[in-house]
Amino acid sequence: MKVLVVGGGGREHAIVHKLSQSDRVEKIYCAPGNAGIGQLAECVNISVEEIEKLKEFALQNKIDITIVGPELPLVEGIVDEFERTGLKIFGPSKKAAMIEGSKYFAKQIMAKYEIPTGRFKAFDRYQEALKFLKETWYPVVIKADGLAQGKGVFIVRDFIEAKEVLDLMMKKRVFGPSGDIVIVEEMLYGKEASIFAFVDGENVLTMMTAMDYKKVYEKDEGPNTGGMGSIAPNPHIDKKTLNEIEEKILKPVVYALKKEGIVYKGVLYAGLMLTKEGPKVLEFNARFGDPETQAILPLLKTDFLEIIEATLEGKLKNLKLEWEDKKAVCVIAASKGYPGEYKKGFEIRGLEEVKEAFVYHAGTSFKDGKIVTSGGRVFGIVALGDSYKEAREIAYREIEKISFEGIYYRKDIAAGY
């Protein structure tokens, strides 16, 4: 079977790696891919936004299944485009991907179908939002409605901070049209959790749980990032909690979308807060998480391609997922300055020294025969162990073997577990 993976980050490297372990996969293409992915797949120089070109490539190369990594092409309607031409593609339709593409849409669905989430108000006018922020309790969370690469969520402690964020979104328009609608949400307290499930339109098959580390600095300080590390399984979720999440959140949202005339197929990712009142939804995403995927997929024993096919064919109820009885720890190495301004093009040394962990490339490329940095998050080291402590020790031991100018990573991933 020929498979095309769309994307070029650490998540896509983990997907390509998992696919490469399937006997049924003959050839993997990845668009655009990166320096690490290029060792397992043929990288194709087409960006994730170029849907028409991706479709042409899939047709010309007789691709059997396309798997979409990032959210942007999903929200832009890549699945609808491919299906129109009879191509098999894994991911939700444009309408279904709205669950991630518009936080306001997701909140409306949750409110209508009583899916547990924080109280909220949405504004499309600056003055109305400002008036509300003058009168509200603090802290609150302000979110851009649309896609913002994980950087459109702000916790604000007082009106001064709130006005700064509002100006950023609605006056300076740093997120462009994504900030045309702004959500003000109550602050939820507890432990964060990421839950992923395969959804075939009807059935929900939950994956291994995970926990990610969003803040750039240790002790969860500093600005939000796309994720600085992750661990799997999530130490705060037991069987009872997972069951509650499935019955009160995952299944109800799939049902709610169906009632609205939207069939959801692909991966559903619920970002949750485990509060004293039970799990509540922070956000929904329409794809695999990054960097959670890098911790989850190495633990998967079931053939990945088989799961993808069962999802597309509506046959998930016949499938049972099998997992390694181990813990996974993923530590992300980033460029100095990330998530703000950073320089690229630095040579990465020591990659071949890593023997006891997986290295999943994110912002890497080839230049003059050398692997160099090309993004904010450069790579992730993923180690498995019988305990979080063992996996953590291996991950940090291995990451020390790799260097590039300005390398930065958090030293507290999986600490205390």
Swiss-Prot record:
GO biological process entries: 'de novo' IMP biosynthetic process; purine nucleobase biosynthetic process
Molecular function in Gene Ontology: ATP binding; metal ion binding; phosphoribosylamine-glycine ligase activity
Domain annotation ATP-grasp: ranges: 107-313
This protein's pathway: Purine metabolism; IMP biosynthesis via de novo pathway; N(1)-(5-phospho-D-ribosyl)glycinamide from 5-phospho-alpha-D-ribose 1-diphosphate: step 2/2
Residue positions binding Mg(2+): E283, N285
Highest taxon above the source species: Bacteria
Obligatory cofactor(s): Mg(2+); Mn(2+)
The enzyme's E.C. designation: 6.3.4.13
NCBIfam families per UniProt: purD
Protein name per Swiss-Prot or TrEMBL: Phosphoribosylamine--glycine ligase
